[in-house]
């Protein structure tokens, strides 16, 4: 009875175990996740790419920048769009921005290209005999120092005929010539040479070209985007929480200047101070003002310009007559505006550098090249070098509430004396200089000071002041002051994520149906969750393609406009690069989609299972709480692995599809009678006949071998054999007696078809008998295995129950034995303790008894 109960329990356990296992399998299958490809996701990565320019310049303007921008830049967008990216935090670094390097190279290339067709002034490297100039003016009170600012020089120069020379007179600024061997004994006459002749070649700027810059917009090619930081308190480096995306930057004027930044953008709220490292006094400090300061510069004289032939087909432009005082070039700055601005700058510097007990001092430049020690800039085609000591000569006093300044200026206008140079060594490059031809007439230019470039003196141990001086010289800092809030990123429209959808069947691809989604822009959904952003994928993907096409058309028109020049500028080359890069990126993405079997699809499920080692986050965490940017960072290390698995899966699917299509041609009954299949039928027929003949031979050989083993001689199976029974012997062997008297013969078959039919019949019977025997044997083996297995399982179950009971009894016996032993040991311990206690308690009694005995 006990065994039957155990068997019944075991059967119940088997049923419940099978049910639980099935439920586990179903649940696990229901939770399987598969890789799904998304095209058009708002994901980007930092990148460096070739930017192109846009400008609204007019083609009829003769100014070089304008001509260059008109022919080499695309027109600006009259309605530029800026798309805010909510819930996005991006890192910016103005000190490691490739846009700055590109702009620096572009402006240098612009200046170099403007000089290429111009006249080389190498013949001017001759000995100059110079003396002070005589000024033709009604005012006879002319300062001697001002007279020495310009020299009237004579020199011999080749005329239109190379074998003839003539003496030529022209005027040079004192800064452009250097004496040879000291002054002569004549006092006001000596030998000079041009300042560049021992270091660099000189090229005269083309006379119809001025250097007044116009705004230039830098634009990203298709497949890339420009991110803009709109955080007012952004200091140029670090995370920015107010980010937007634009296709082009704002209009940036390529103003080449030192110490002061002119006609740039202004800060919002308050003055902004930016530096790569505030504690390093070797790093430049870029100050962005919140309110512009007007600066008016002028050369008050009325100059004339003359052309001097220096050889066949070459002309040198020099200053002719001088009307008025040409040396009195100067700039005017409002003292009130400047003091107010500098006080705000000092307040911001104090926050970054010093404590509340330190004064801030502004001082003039400590020395260096004239481009560094003065405020150098271009005004109306002339290069001014102005002394800024009047601007940087004050102290921010500690504890003074009215921001008292000590300025060495009495009037309300600060006058900055300026000098003019015509030989300019641009970009601090050795070996190349430019001669700026003089500009006739009065020159006046009005600009806005929008920024300052400062350097900080090293702080000594015994000083409580911080001294700041004007700096500059590296034009990258000028461009950095405008490009600090931009960065270029590469759009990565392909994304993979786990979903429950699986590519289940092998079928021909169909183009995905577009979803009617509201237009948010390609990167507009960057801050949305993955689930919300996936709704706009169709619109984003179409916008990407349309943006590429539109941009290619604009670039193509700009390139076509340069064909009459028979050459391309640096911008033309970059536009070609931008066109190729945009098409290449789009084709690369489409190639990947085609390899994965996702051509024309925005959401493409695959049959690649999602590996939890890539990311073990749940579906709700992924699609409801994460953005595509966060998800891309989560799986960026496994992206290439996933791509390879998708490609392998698609390759296998194509193989399966090819096999399926190969079988599809037999689906129609009429295809069986197609003439193209006849050769295939003949081949199969020949194979069957050959197989039958081979089997016939094999069975014949086996039959002969079998008969030989039984003692018979091999006879032809096509010969009729007649056996005459002996009168006293029955048919066959003794055990076969009693059979009827008849002849025994082998069946004689004649003809091809009867022979084939007989062989086929024998083959079928043989196969049937052998297969039946094999099936019976297999069924018997399976039945035996099942019975033995069930008996073994029952035996093992009973054995487990038996040994469980035995172990239980053994454990109980062990516990009883331990309890008894512990009880005995405990009783002895208690008895010993009791005896010790009684002995201790009887000590007084024993003492009393001892005393009583002693007294007795």
Curated annotation (Swiss-Prot):
Short sequence motif Di-leucine internalization motif: positions: 855-856
Region spans: V5: 461-471, 463-471
A single Gene Ontology CC term: host cell plasma membrane
Keywords of this entry: AIDS, Apoptosis, Clathrin-mediated endocytosis of virus by host, Cleavage on pair of basic residues, Coiled coil, Disulfide bond, Fusion of virus membrane with host endosomal membrane, Fusion of virus membrane with host membrane, Glycoprotein, Host cell membrane, Host endosome, Host membrane, Host-virus interaction, Lipoprotein, Membrane, Palmitate, Signal, Transmembrane, Transmembrane helix, Viral attachment to host cell, Viral envelope protein, Viral immunoevasion, Viral penetration into host cytoplasm, Virion, Virus endocytosis by host, Virus entry into host cell
Annotated region (Fusion peptide), positions in chain: 512-532
Segment forming the signal sequence: 1-31
Keyword Metal-binding on entry: no
Coiled-coil residues: 633-667
Region named MPER: 662-683
Site (Cleavage): 511-512
Processing and modification events after translation: Highly glycosylated by host. The high number of glycan on the protein is reffered to as 'glycan shield' because it contributes to hide protein sequence from adaptive immune system.
V3: region residues: 297-330
Motif placement: YXXL motif: 712-715
Region (V4): 386-418
Residue numbers spanned by region CD4-binding loop: 365-375
HAMAP family found in the cross-reference section: HIV_ENV
Stated name of the protein: Envelope glycoprotein gp160
Lineage per the UniProt record: Viruses, Riboviria, Pararnavirae, Artverviricota, Revtraviricetes
Gene (name only): env
């Amino acid at each position: 009875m006990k065994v039957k109960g155990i068997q019944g329990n075991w059967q119940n356990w088997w049923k419940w175990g099978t049910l639980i296992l099935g439920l586990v399998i179903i649940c696990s299958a229901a939770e399987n996740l598969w890789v799904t490809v998304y095209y058009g996701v708002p994901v980007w990565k930092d990148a460096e790419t070739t930017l192109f320019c846009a400008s609204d310049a007019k083609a009829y303007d003769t100014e070089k920048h304008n001509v260059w921008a008109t022919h080499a830049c695309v027109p600006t967008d009259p309605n530029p769009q800026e798309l805010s990216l909510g819930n996005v935090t991006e890192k910016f670094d103005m000190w490691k921005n490739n846009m700055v390097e590109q702009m620096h190279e572009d402006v240098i290339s612009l200046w170099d290209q403007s000089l290429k067709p111009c006249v080389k002034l190498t013949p001017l490297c001759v000995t100059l005999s110079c003396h002070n100039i005589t000024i033709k003016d009604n005012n006879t009170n002319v300062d001697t120092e001002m007279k020495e600012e310009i020299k009237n020089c004579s020199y011999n120069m080749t005329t239109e005929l190379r074998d003839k020379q003539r003496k030529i007179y022209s005027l040079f600024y004192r800064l452009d010539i250097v004496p040879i061997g000291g002054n002569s004994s004549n006092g006001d006459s000596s030998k000079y040479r041009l300042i560049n002749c021992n270091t660099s070649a000189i090229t005269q700027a083309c006379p119809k070209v001025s250097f007044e810059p116009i705004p230039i917009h830098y634009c990203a090619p298709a497949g890339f985007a420009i991110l803009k930081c709109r955080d007012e308190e952004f200091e140029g480096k670090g995370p920015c929480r107010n980010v937007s995306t634009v296709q082009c930057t704002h209009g940036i004027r390529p103003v080449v200047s030192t110490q002061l930044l002119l006609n740039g953008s202004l800060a919002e709220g308050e003055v902004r101070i930016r530096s790569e490292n505030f504690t390093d006094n070797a790093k430049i400090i870029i100050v962005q003002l919140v309110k512009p300061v007007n600066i008016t510069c002028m050369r008050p004289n009325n100059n004339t310009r003359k052309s001097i032939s220096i050889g066949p087909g070459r002309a040198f432009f020099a200053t002719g007559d001088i009307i008025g005082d040409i040396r009195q070039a100067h700039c005017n700055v409002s003292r009130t505006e400047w003091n107010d601005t500098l006080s705000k700058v000092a307040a911001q510097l104090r926050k970054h550098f010093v404590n509340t007990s330190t004064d801030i001092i502004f001082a003039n430049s400590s020395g260096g090249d004239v481009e560094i020690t003065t405020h150098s800039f271009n005004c109306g085609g002339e290069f001014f070098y102005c002394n800024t000591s009047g601007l940087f000569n004050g102290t921010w006093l500690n504890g003074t509430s009215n921001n008292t300044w000590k300025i060495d200026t009495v009037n309300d206008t600060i006058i900055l004396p300026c000098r003019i140079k015509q030989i300019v060594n641009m970009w601090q490059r050795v070996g190349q200089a430019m001669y700026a031809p003089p500009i006739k007439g009065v020159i006046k230019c009005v600009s806005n000071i929008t920024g300052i470039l400062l350097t900080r003196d090293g702080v000594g141990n015994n000083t409580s002041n911080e001294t700041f001086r004007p700096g500059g010289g590296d034009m990258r800092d000028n461009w950095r002051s405008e490009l600090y809030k931009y960065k270029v990123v590469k759009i990565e429209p392909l994304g993979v994520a786990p979903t429950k959808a699986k590519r289940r069947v092998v079928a021909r691809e169909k183009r995905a149906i577009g979803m009617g989604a509201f237009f948010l822009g390609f990167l507009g959904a960057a801050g949305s969750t993955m689930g919300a952003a996936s709704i706009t994928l169709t619109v984003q993907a179409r916008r990407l393609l349309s943006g590429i096409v539109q941009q290619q058309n604009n670039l193509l028109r700009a390139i076509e406009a340069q064909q009459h020049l028979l050459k391309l500028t640096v911008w033309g080359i970059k536009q070609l690069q931008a066109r190729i890069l945009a098409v290449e990126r789009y084709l690369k993405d489409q190639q990947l989609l085609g390899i994965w079997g996702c051509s024309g699809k925005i959401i493409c499920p695959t049959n690649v299972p999602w590996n939890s080692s890539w990311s073990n986050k749940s579906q709700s965490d992924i699609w409801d709480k994460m953005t595509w940017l966060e998800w891309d960072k989560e799986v960026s290390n496994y992206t290439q692995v996933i791509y390879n698995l998708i490609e392998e899966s698609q390759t296998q699917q194509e193989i399966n599809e090819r096999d399926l299509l190969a079988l599809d041609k037999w689906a129609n009954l009429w295809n069986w009678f197609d003439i193209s299949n006849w050769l295939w039928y003949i081949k199969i027929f020949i194979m069957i006949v050959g197989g039958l003949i081979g089997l016939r031979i094999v069975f014949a050989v086996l039959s002969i071998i079998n008969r030989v083993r039984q003692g018979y001689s091999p006879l032809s199976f096509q010969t009729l054999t007649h056996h005459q029974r002996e009168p006293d012997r029955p048919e066959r062997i003794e055990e076969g007696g009693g059979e009827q008297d008849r002849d025994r013969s082998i069946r004689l078959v004649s003809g091809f078809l009867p022979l084939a039919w007989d062989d086929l019949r024998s083959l079928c019977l043989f196969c049937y008998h052998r297969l039946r025997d094999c099936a019976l044997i297999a069924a018997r083996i399976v039945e035996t295995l099942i019975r033995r297995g069930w008996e073994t399982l029952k035996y093992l179950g009973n054995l487990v129950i038996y040994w469980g009971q035995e172990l239980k009894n053994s454990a109980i016996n062990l516990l009883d034995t331990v309890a008894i032993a512990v009880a005995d040991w405990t009783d002895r311990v208690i008895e010993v303790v009791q005896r010790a206690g009684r002995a201790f308690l009887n000590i007084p009694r024993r003492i009393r008894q001892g005393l009583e005995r002693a007294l007795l």
